[in-house]
Each structure stands twice: as structure tokens, then as C-alpha cells.
From Swiss-Prot:
This is Acetyl-coenzyme A synthetase. Mg(2+) binds at V545, H547, V550. The modification N6-acetyllysine is found at K620. GO terms for molecular function: acetate-CoA ligase activity; AMP binding; ATP binding; metal ion binding. Keywords: Acetylation, ATP-binding, Ligase, Magnesium, Metal-binding, Nucleotide-binding. The keyword Acetylation applies. It holds the Pfam family ACAS_N. The keyword Acetylation applies. The lineage of its organism: Bacteria, Pseudomonadati, Pseudomonadota, Betaproteobacteria, Nitrosomonadales. InterPro entries: Ac_CoA_lig, ACAS_N, AMP-bd_C, AMP-bd_C_sf, AMP-dep_synth/lig_dom, ANL_N_sf. Belongs to the ATP-dependent AMP-binding enzyme family. Its EC number is 6.2.1.1.
Length: 655
């Protein structure tokens, strides 16, 4: 990667407020530096101390880090624990009646669930899974609405040592099918439908379609939660109603004690080369990362009401809905709906209603709400808030300032968190009682995280110059491998050409400023970031080319003030170039096609048609040229090797 010049200049800085510091878990830069130096002096001992402090072990570990077979690192691997026990049972002696979850439905129904009630529901469902013959090590795909039942399903899997793979409810039947096949799932947990923004979306019908696509004989059971009550097709020998499965089950289910390295879940994330990657996380190391970040980054206190708006189909929903908040005994809000239904103040109404103290959402949501003006949030009482968080993509400085001044009323710290599906928990983020914030920067690594920006050789990049973002030492919450694909894991995350394969390569470019703060600059591969979600170009291109009208396709991202990026598709049809009316009709057909193949989130915003794609005479796609075309920029690249220059004019036409 050539050196990247940083053009962002941001000089505003916001030290932690004295009132916040007085009550913070980590107070001041001296405390932060002391923790960081402790980790440098005794790296393994630092993490062992935290693991003993925050995790309840059935069998204590004696080994800390096994680095004898890099990059396949192991942590605490002679210890035993159960994740569900750590999230539920250990709270029952002191706070069984404390509210664990405040659920707010799409239509405004509120359900409160205590730790005792949640424990009972998880045990009943886990017993139901066992009654179906599901055992430790089996894989289950979860395709659920954003309701308490999704958390119950995940926790029940963890309770009996079953590896769950959650699929976002907006993904298509084909996406569900691919994940079922790759995981070798023995069961699918779903619902009749989900409701979002006043609309219903089929889930069970999508699962049925997925199971009819190929050899899915590994799936012997489909468990269906009755949500909307709509009529759905039924296969009596395979399908089971959730309520029938759990009705006669005991409220107690002995946890299965598993090795610290036992896989807790796989979560599929987009790659730049087509097939989604099954990111595999361990039990103990993953949980430790979630707990530590709840304590440090979110500065958790027992009276907090925590609300992370993410769906459990994404890693943020795993770490900061299903596992992190419950492991520390927090009360949290779970929301089924969208920010603007049935009115544009829905987020602020929920914060006011439930006295939310910690609010964690995506820049996409923030940008969409900015457009509605500052008057709207001012109608609501947001005085309960004490901390704001941002996740999913870098937040631009002006959105940060709006979030801080309008929502946080210039008193709530904003924690801009950098992390990934693969890291499992926060890596770089401002500890709010210690680190001064800069709008647009994720600031400094957490203690124990050895992050750096390096050039192609693995040497430190110059200050202010872009380079590869890496983590130089293994850390407990990192992915262990890619499901059934260890070589892809090694080549993707520990490539031999950077520092001999010893560094974790994040796939992001970044630079550091004069204070050592990290600034994320974007992806170094061809993964798109649409509304905070990573989507592979190859997957979308493959879907387009699968349509009988399409001969070739390439997609790139185009900056969008609300969604971060939108997808622009450059398409070569099998026939001649269409006229304007035909082009509009074909473009809409292809948009719908991609939505059905992958999911609505992958729907191209723009489709442009040309006689062929811009390639060099050696046949290499000129993707950077496409990015310039998508953005309406003046072409500055050398086009002397372009095979057919006339297509530049053709691809300038937006449909």
C-alpha cells in the first residue's frame, strides 16, 4: 500500500469532565498509563489477573497464554467455565429480582424480565434443545427478531455447549442456506415473522426456502417462536413450536462446563474474495473482552440502564447485548424497532421513558437523526444520559459534535470505539474518565492491546502517514480461526509479508497524530461499509452476474452522509446497451435481484451500464477508476492502458 496522506485536521479536544472523573472506574491518564505499563511489564500476568477478577471458573486455569503454534493462540486453556452461568446463575444470590432486560417492541409494548425470570427461560429452552437430541459441540443457526427470545436462544446454546451462529434477520434465504451448510447446523431457531418500522418480514418462510436449496439434511429440527401469529407452512416431522417445546420443561438446567477454548459461536462476516468467513470465538477469552470493555469503556455502574441499539445478528449485539451486559449484571434495553417509527423521536422517547444512562449506536443512525434537526431531541428529557458511544464505522467530526452537544448536552463523554467481529470486543477507544476525546478519533488502545500503524514491511509508519492497522500481540478476545478454514484464517489475518506473519492485520488503514491518537481512514481491501455493516464486493458482484441478463459486474462504495457508503454497481449486460427506459427497468430488476440473493442491505443505490468494464490490456479491473466515476471525480489516473476509453462516458450515466 502506498503511503496515504492524512487530509483530516481536527484540533478540538475534550478532556473528561471533573464530575464524571470523580465517579469513574478508571480516573485520569495516570491510572490509564499505570495499567498500560503493567500490561507491558507482565503481559500474560496482566490478563490472568483480569480473568480471575471478572470470570467465575468451575475449574481454575493454571496456563495463561499458549503461543507455541502461532497464529493459533490459546488462553487459559486448562480452565473450565460456562458462559451462561457467568451471565445468569452467579447473579441469582445477590440480584435475582433485578431487571435484566427492558424490552420495547416495535409498537411500544414493554416487557421487563428479571435475572431470575431470564434464567428460568434459558433453562427451559436449553432443556427443550436437549430433548431434541442436541448436544455439546452441535451447531445451531439462529435467525430471529430482535426480542428477548433471541437472547434466550443464544444463552441456552451457551448453557449446554452448543455453538450458535446468528444470521441477521435481513439476510436472504441464500445467505441462510450458505451458513447452514458451512456450519453443518443440526437445527435452526427462528420465528414466524419479524416486525420493524411497522412492517412484517417473513422469517420462517425464508428458512423453508433456504432448507429447500440443497442438501440440508444435517438440519433435523426447526424451532419457531410465534411472534405475529400469521399462518405459516409446517412440516410436522421437522418443525417445532417454541412454546410447545418449552411448556413442560424444568426451570433448572445444569450447565455444561466447557474448556476455556471451547467455541462459543461462529459469526459470518463478509470477505473480499466471495465466501463469507465463519469467525470462530472462544468462550473464556471472548467473555473476558466483553466484560473488561463494559467496565472500562462504558464505565459500568450498578445503577446504569444500558442501551446498545445493535441487532444480535451483528457482533455488537453479541458482545454488548447478549453477553457483556448480562455478565456484569446490568439492566439493559432491547429494542425491536427502528429510530423513526412510529415517529422520528423514537430513540429519544425510549431514553426518556426508561431513564437510559449509556447509549451505544452507529454513526449511520446519528447522521440520519441529524437531518431531522436539533429541535426534535430537545422535546425529550435526556438528562438521564451520562455516556454516549459510537460503533460500526468511524464517526465524522461534525456528527461527533452534534452527538456530544445536542444529545449529550455537552456533558456526556462520547466513546468512539474501534473493534471488529474478529476482535470480539473493543480494541481502541477512549476510557471516558481518563482519555481526552478528539472528534473523529478512536483515541488510544485499551491497556493490554498492542496496536500500531505499520508500512508494508511491518515497520512503524511515520506520524500522520497512513499505514496498516495491526495488533502486535495476541489478546484473549481475538478470533481463534475461521470455521473449517484455518489456512484462510492465517493468510487473511496474519499474512507472512507483514512482519513475518506475527501481527494481526485488521484490514483497516489508519494514521496516528502527534499525541499518538489513532484515526481510522478506511478499509484497505474491497469490503464496503454500508450503514456500519461490512459487505464483500465479490458477493454482490457474484449475485449480479448470476442474473441471466448480466455478463459482468463490479461494485464500489460511494460516500453517503447518512449511511457511510452506498453501493454503486457497474454492469455489462449480455445484450446491447439499453436505452434510458430499458435501463431504468433493468436497474430496478437487478436491485430486487440482489436483495433476494443477499439481502436488502446489499441493494445497489446506483446502477450504471457500459459495453465493458474498465480493464487494463492485461485484463486487470481498474477498480480505482470506478471509484472516481462513482464519486463524480475528475479522472486523474493513467488511462493509457484502458482497453476501451469510450466506456468512461457510458459509466458516467447514473440510473
Amino acid at each position: 500500500m502506498a503511503t496515504i496522506e492524512s487530509i483530516l485536521r481536527e484540533n478540538r479536544i475534550f478532556p473528561p469532565a471533573n464530575e464524571f472523573v470523580r465517579h469513574a472506574n478508571i480516573t485520569g491518564m495516570k491510572t490509564y498509563e499505570a495499567l498500560r505499563q503493567e500490561a507491558e511489564r507482565d503481559y500474560a500476568g496482566f490478563w490472568a489477573k483480569l480473568a480471575k477478577q471478572y470470570i467465575t471458573w468451575h475449574k481454575p486455569f493454571t496456563r495463561i497464554l499458549d503461543d507455541t503454534n502461532p497464529p493459533f493462540y490459546k488462553w487459559f486453556d486448562d480452565g473450565e467455565l460456562n458462559i451462561s452461568w457467568n451471565c445468569l446463575d452467579r447473579h441469582l444470590t445477590t440480584q435475582a429480582n433485578k431487571t435484566a432486560i427492558i424490552f420495547e417492541s416495535d409498537e411500544g409494548e414493554v416487557i421487563r424480565c428479571s435475572y431470575r425470570e431470564l434464567h428460568q427461560r434459558v433453562c427451559r429452552f436449553a432443556n427443550g434443545l436437549k430433548a431434541l437430541g442436541i448436544r455439546q459441540g452441535d451447531r445451531i443457526v439462529i435467525y430471529m427478531p430482535m426480542r428477548i427470545e433471541a437472547v434466550v436462544a443464544m444463552q441456552a446454546c451457551a448453557r449446554i455447549g452448543v455453538i450458535h451462529s446468528v444470521v441477521f434477520g435481513g439476510f436472504s434465504a441464500k445467505s441462510v442456506y450458505e451458513r447452514i451448510i458451512d456450519a453443518g447446523a443440526s437445527a435452526v431457531i427462528t420465528a414466524d415473522e419479524q416486525t420493524r418500522g411497522g412492517k412484517r418480514h417473513a422469517l420462517k418462510a425464508t428458512v423453508d426456502e433456504a432448507l429447500a436449496m440443497g442438501d440440508t439434511t444435517s438440519v433435523h429440527s426447526v424451532i419457531v417462536f410465534r411472534h405475529t401469529g400469521t399462518d405459516i407452512p409446517w412440516q410436522p416431522e421437522r418443525d417445532r413450536w417454541w412454546h410447545n417445546l418449552t411448556a413442560s420443561q424444568s426451570d433448572e438446567c445444569e450447565p455444561i462446563w466447557v474448556n476455556a477454548e471451547h467455541p462459543l459461536f461462529t459469526l459470518y462476516t463478509s470477505g473480499s474474495t466471495g465466501k463469507p468467513k465463519g469467525v470462530q470465538h472462544s468462550s473464556a477469552g471472548y467473555l473476558l473482552g466483553a466484560i473488561v470493555s463494559m467496565q472500562w469503556v462504558f464505565d459500568y455502574h450498578s445503577e446504569d440502564i444500558f442501551w446498545c441499539t445493535a441487532d444480535v445478528g451483528w457482533v455488537t449485539g453479541h458482545s454488548y447485548v447478549t453477553y457483556g451486559p448480562l455478565a456484569i449484571g446490568a439492566t439493559q434495553v432491547i429494542f425491536e424497532g427502528t429510530p423513526t417509527y412510529p415517529h422520528a423521536g423514537r430513540f429519544w422517547e425510549i431514553i426518556q421513558k426508561h431513564r437510559v444512562t449509556t447509549f451505544y449506536t452507529a454513526p449511520t443512525a446519528i447522521r440520519s437523526l441529524i437531518k431531522l434537526g436539533p429541535d426534535l431531541p430537545e422535546k425529550y428529557d435526556l438528562s438521564s444520559l451520562r455516556l454516549l458511544g459510537s460503533v460500526g464505522e468511524p464517526i465524522n467530526p461534525e456528527a461527533w459534535m452534534w452527538y456530544y452537544t445536542v444529545i449529550g448536552q455537552s456533558r456526556c463523554p462520547v466513546v468512539d470505539t474501534w473493534w471488529q467481529t474478529e476482535t470480539g470486543s473493543h480494541m481502541i477507544a477512549p476510557i471516558p474518565g481518563a482519555i481526552p476525546a478528539k472528534p473523529g478519533s478512536c483515541t488510544l488502545p485499551l491497556p493490554g492491546i498492542d496496536a500500531a500503524v505499520v508500512d508494508e514491511t511491518g515497520l512503524p509508519a511515520e506520524q500522520g502517514k497512513g499505514g496498516f492497522l495491526v495488533i502486535k500481540r495476541p489478546f484473549p478476545s481475538m478470533l481463534r480461526t475461521l470455521w473449517n478454514d484455518p489456512e484462510r484464517f492465517r493468510n487473511t489475518y496474519f499474512p507472512a509479508d507483514i512482519a513475518g506473519g506475527h501481527y494481526y492485520l485488521a484490514g483497516d488503514s489508519a494514521h496516528r497524530d502527534q499525541d499518538g491518537y489513532f484515526w481510522i481512514m478506511g478499509r484497505i481491501d474491497d469490503v464496503l461499509n454500508v450503514s456500519g455493516h461490512r459487505l464483500g464486493t465479490m458477493e454482490i458482484e457474484s449475485a449480479l452476474v448470476a442474473h441471466p441478463l448480466v455478463a459482468e459486474a463490479a461494485v464500489v462504495g460511494k460516500p453517503h452522509e447518512i449511511r457511510g457508503e452506498v453501493i454503486v454497481a457497474f454492469v455489462v449486460l449480455r445484450g446491447k446497451l439499453p436505452d434510458d427506459q430499458q435501463a431504468a427497468e433493468i436497474a430496478e430488476t437487478l436491485r430486487e435481484w440482489v436483495s433476494s440473493e443477499i439481502g436488502a442491505i446489499a441493494r445497489p443505490e446506483e446502477i450504471r451500464f457500459g459495453e465493458n468494464l474498465p480493464k487494463t490490456r492485461s485484463g486487470k479491473l481498474m477498480r480505482r477508476l470506478l471509484r472516481s466515476l462513482a464519486r463524480g471525480e475528475t479522472i486523474t489516473q493513467d488511462i493509457s492502458t484502458l482497453e476501451n476509453p469510450v466506456i468512461l462516458e457510458q459509466f458516467s450515466q447514473t440510473i
